[in-house]
Amino acid sequence: MSLNAMNSCEIEFERNVNLQAGAISIGRASDNDLRIPDQTVSAHHARIFTYLEASFIEDLGSTNGTYLNGKRVQKHTLHPGDVIQVGRLELKVTKDN
């Protein structure tokens, strides 16, 4: 599975991010894999990881929350078509061909 940015928030990562690469950190700090320069995003906001061929999103105690399909989540399985929202950025989970 991959992530695709759905809006024009200027972020420092490729438009397509492969979720099979292990854990991916998301946040405002420069040491994140997906750096989001948005004041509504915590320094270390969330992470996405794969375990036994399933991918998960996990909030890391962020102030403003991590949303999956419009609902605030702490930890949840990801499926193709899901939409993750972190700050003002929306990312769509897609299935690789």
Predicted regions and their residues:
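C-terminal boundary/linker segments immediately following FHA domains
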Residues: 56, 67-97
